[in-house]
Amino acid sequence: MRVRDGSWSSRQTRLVDGAVESVQRMTFPAPVVERTKAGARKLGDVYWRELRRSTLGVFRTSTANDEFEIRLLGRGPALLRFSRGEEAVSADTVSCRYPIVGGLLARGPAGSIRFTQQGTDVVAVTSAVEGFLPRLGVIYAPVQSRIHVALGRRYFTRLQREAGR
């Protein structure tokens, strides 16, 4: 398969059980992070920093009880709660996955958000929500999904800047 540098794609799917999947993908001419656990963590860290930056601080992240949380203005109940990031590194892939464990916007502990860089020369980076069960499925597509897609574009731009490309 030939990968074109700079190509962008986005896909949203709603599964039979109501779970949603949203995948944004962009290619780069070279790796944007090292193929190490630190590189895997950086994929996640850049996304969470970009969440706060691009929403002007409306959505803020914090760590509590070995969980990672997103809160509105950093207060009140968690909108989404995640387990600690799980880094994975192989010969041509580096990724960081955050299992969803709850929050006001989740129907329960299901799904994850995963950030992956795959390839060795030209690489594909993905931001993927997998198997997420939104509490309010009717507002997921018009609200949460759009936020994830817009944030995905900003995330890829930030990765590119930080990699100096």
Language model features by range: what are they?
Residues 55-56, 106, 163:
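Amphipathic alpha-helical interaction segments
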Residues 65-67, 99-103, 128-132:
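Generic short beta-strand segments
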Residues 139-165:
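A conserved amphipathic terminal alpha-helix motif
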Residues 72-120:
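Hydrophobic-ligand binding "helix-grip"
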Residues 105-142:
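Beta-strand/loop substructures that line and gate deep hydrophobic ligand-binding cavities in soluble
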Residues 1-74:
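Charge-rich, low-complexity N-terminal segments
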Residues 26, 96, 124-125:
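A broad, low-specificity signal marking well-ordered, structured residues that form hydrophobic/aromatic
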